[in-house]
Amino acid sequence: MDFVRLARLFARARPMGLFILQHLDPCRARWAGGREGLMRPMWAPFSSSSSQLPLGQERQENTGSLGSDPSHSNSTATQEEDEEEEESFGTLSDKYSSRRLFRKSAAQFHNLRFGERRDEQMEPEPKLWRGRRNTPYWYFLQCKHLIKEGKLVEALDLFERQMLKEERLQPMESNYTVLIGGCGRVGYLKKAFNLYNQMKKRDLEPSDATYTALFNVCAESPWKDSALQSALKLRQQLQAKNFELNLKTYHALLKMAAKCADLRMCLDVFKEIIHKGHVVTEETFSFLLMGCIQDKKTGFRYALQVWRLMLSLGLQPSRDSYNLLLVAARDCGLGDPQVASELLLKPREEATVLQPPVSRQRPRRTAQAKAGNLMSAMLHVEALERQLFLEPSQALGPPEPPEARVPGKAQPEVDTKAEPSHTAALTAVALKPPPVELEVNLLTPGAVPPTVVSFGTVTTPADRLALIGGLEGFLSKMAEHRQQPDIRTLTLLAEVVESGSPAESLLLALLDEHQVEADLTFFNTLVRKKSKLGDLEGAKALLPVLAKRGLVPNLQTFCNLAIGCHRPKDGLQLLTDMKKSQVTPNTHIYSALINAAIRKLNYTYLISILKDMKQNRVPVNEVVIRQLEFAAQYPPTFDRYQGKNTYLEKIDGFRAYYKQWLTVMPAEETPHPWQKFRTKPQGDQDTGKEADDGCALGGR
């Protein structure tokens, strides 16, 4: 036996009886840990170093070395050596790490846990309300008062933070409805439907006012497509529940259809209103006129046809209806002149179409009479729908026979548009030479002379105003219906009358005649029209009149003056005057000056404008960039080697300055339409796309 194995026998071999003594503390007579027993140095055989062993283990080794069997000791020593190696493997890491268990994990779970910890740090637990406890009705009145003052953010914060989190009150249906109505005024679609979802989660039954506010917020939303989808889904849900809408809710739905859809959907809603037995009012036709205005090509003809239907049903138009008619004359066209002539200049045929069939039966009872009135109204609407969307081939009818086009029987055409009075833009046909001026007012079907058979060229707002009587005829028609013009009516008239005409000069006199207080928008309209004509001095002459009425020019006034600054000295003088008045020009003013300089191809003037814009650090928007990119392009036929062009000889200098100017100018950031209404703007990074996605009823 070699010395190594002999040393192992003395070091490892021990009887089983002494193994228990290793775990018994000799001093206190209690069990002790195997590694925490009493330790003392012991010299191992054939070793020059001392080892720290427990006291019981030392005794065990000394006794076992004397009375153990060699063969048994050999197997026991090998087994104990393997157990010690298994126990000591991996124990070195205990000094550096305390983790005992490792699991597989993904990065997103760590991000979620980190986000939860961050939210807990940023949003502490709200404190309980310690003041006087209020009622939900008190919060309803407070939110209603704040919304009337235009403080929607404060109303939302009062409801969500103080009422729900601090006082922890159970809200009522009216608390949600008043906030949804406030969101509807500003078009805050996402928040309105969020409140509607919270309302349903609390098992609160929405009222008619709630649905009216929801349809109204869809109508006022800046994103028309997503608002239309949300409104249609809400309407489908109400139809699935057989929920009967009242007239106000139908008006909100009709308003949504007018602003987000087209005239066909408006007529569908209008027919549903009649089918449900509701009595249509002037307000109902006002929303139909809104739907007509959405069609910029044929909306003016649509508006006239809807107007005649309203009169045929015995309804008196209001001042708002007249204002909407002026908007149609300003923004919309007449469409196909031949179709318009067939539909608007033949009142007798139209009356027979709109007239319901006469019954030869005896007078019926009240219920039957009501059903008859309902049927009559439906016939009127269906006849109107057929005429509104009439194709040109259907309106013209069969071709005219050849004998009707004999040269000897041809009748002269007289175009009356050339007269400065703008009474009509029509073509008159008569056996005798017709008068040059024809008084025409299409608002009254019977007022159209029988000699007028077709329209001439109707392209400008002044031409369309002439078809409804002109300035004086329009105001006289309002007087017949006992309506007085307001400042909006006169402002719209100032936009549609022809610039430089005598009617334009009468507008200031009409202010005093009807005792209407003028506002800055009215004078800005007059200043803009004179500036577009190039009459800058005439536009400046209105400033003393404006000051005489106690009004102060704003940025829009200076912007309208900038439209007429075609000469460099006028534009630079305007910028100097604004600087003296301590008014900083905005992007719109510089855009108007840039447009005036581009029209004259004056690159020196253009560089001066850009220098002033750079000095004032006015941010640049997309419109200005588009204007300057157009100015920096060479004309398609420009050839610098063919000849000298006096207008384009300085374009290279402008291109060099423009390239350097772009690198130092700030860009204008368009704010989100709902940013100012959010209670926590810094934590809400919703974009327009997210807003659209959040408006889907299924995901609320």
UniProtKB/Swiss-Prot annotation:
Residues 62-78 have a biased composition (Polar residues). Keywords: Mitochondrion, Repeat, tRNA processing. PPR repeats lie at residues 135-171, 172-206, 207-245, 246-280, 281-317, 318-354, 519-553, 554-585, 586-620. Residues 681-692 have a biased composition (Basic and acidic residues). Belongs to the PTCD1 family. GO terms for biological process: mitochondrial translation; tRNA 3'-end processing. Mitochondrial protein implicated in negative regulation of leucine tRNA levels, as well as negative regulation of mitochondria-encoded proteins and COX activity. Also affects the 3'-processing of mitochondrial tRNAs. This is Pentatricopeptide repeat-containing protein 1, mitochondrial. Abundant in testes, skeletal muscle and heart. Its main location: mitochondrion. It is found in: Mitochondrion; Mitochondrion matrix. One of its GO terms (cellular component) is mitochondrion.
